[in-house]
Design a protein with these regions (language model features):
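Conserved class I S-adenosyl-L-methionine
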Residues: 75-86
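Conserved SAM-binding loop
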Residues: 117-118
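Flexible, glycine-/basic-rich loop-and-beta segments that form/coincide
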Residues: 236-284
Length: 284
């Protein structure tokens, strides 16, 4: 069945279980395991290049996302839904680096990637839940504090499913990343935050008028953090972190910040100070 839920790395394959047990005996720390997986996936990608939407979120961006969530939420416990969780690297980064008790659920349509993510979580010893499903289609999910996604970019092939969404195009296939943003907001608590890694030209690209129409009615764009272009294969593929909330009566002055580097400690420190000021309601 396509709706199988894999929790805590459970799987039917005995061989996988045996391999996982052997790996656990190496007794690495969680952070060491995560770095090992990232290294192996990078090496594998050099010999067998991954399609763009299967590549994992770069470590620096994942850690930046952790910082953002730490600043936005002061609570000790937090629920996170990741849409299009892929190999589970972003989720694993939250579970190993976030200084909170995390209830994490990753949703992914690709059964192979789900198996890989669940197996990795099992070996590292992470309490992670995964569900297989098309994140554009409605799912029975509880609302979360955080909905996060490194959005897959491209056209969504099923026009009938797309047509149920406000961002749907009547002229052509609808952008999948627009559909995921609209659907993702439905799983967000009223005071939660949706954090989307999306193309930098999101608000000016084709179909952007449809997206902006939906944004105006249903969401508040509270922050835009553009990422350094050198992180991406080309300037055209550059991405920005867009932070959204459900529409509310309280107007928030958006935080707009061009992040010039993720390697330069001074640049990062300045960004962190500015973001902290913004979250505390201080004029930047």
């Amino acid at each position: 069945s396509s709706d199988l839920i894999y929790l805590d790395g459970e799987t039917e394959l005995e061989k996988v279980k045996e391999n996982n047990q052997a790996l656990k005996r190496l007794a690495l720390r969680k952070e060491e395991w995560l770095k090992t997986y990232q290294f192996l996936l990078m090496k594998a990608g050099q010999t067998e290049p991954l399609q763009a939407n299967h590549q994992f979120t770069p470590d620096a961006i994942a850690l930046l996302s952790v910082f953002i969530v730490e600043e936005l939420f002061k609570e000790e416990e937090i629920t996170i839904l990741e849409m299009g969780s892929g190999m589970g690297i972003l989720g694993a980064t939250f579970l190993t680096s976030l200084d909170k008790k995390v209830d994490y659920l990753g949703m992914e349509v690709d059964d192979l990637l789900i198996d890989l993510a669940a197996s990795m979580a099992d070996v590292i010893g992470l309490q992670a839940g995964f569900v297989q499903g098309d994140a554009v289609r409605p799912q029975m999910l509880k609302e979360s504090d955080v909905v996060i996604s490194d959005l897959p970019v491209g056209y969504y092939p099923d026009d009938a499913v797309a047509s149920r969404h406000q961002v749907a195009s009547s002229q052509e296939h609808t952008y999948a990343h627009h559909l995921l943003m609209e659907q993702g907001l439905k799983y967000l608590k009223s005071d939660g935050y949706a954090i989307f890694l999306a193309p930098s030209d999101l608000l000016t690209s084709p179909q952007s008028d449809l997206l902006k129409g939906w944004l105006k009615e249903e969401a508040s764009l509270v922050a835009m953090i553009s990422l350094p272009e050198n992180l991406f294969a080309s300037a055209k593929q550059s991405k920005t972190i867009f932070i959204l909330q459900k529409k509310s009566e309280i107007a928030v002055e958006p935080f707009v910040y061009p992040l010039a580097s993720l390697q330069d400690a001074n640049v990062l420190m300045k960004f962190k100070e500015n973001f902290q000021k913004w979250t505390q309601g201080t004029e930047i």
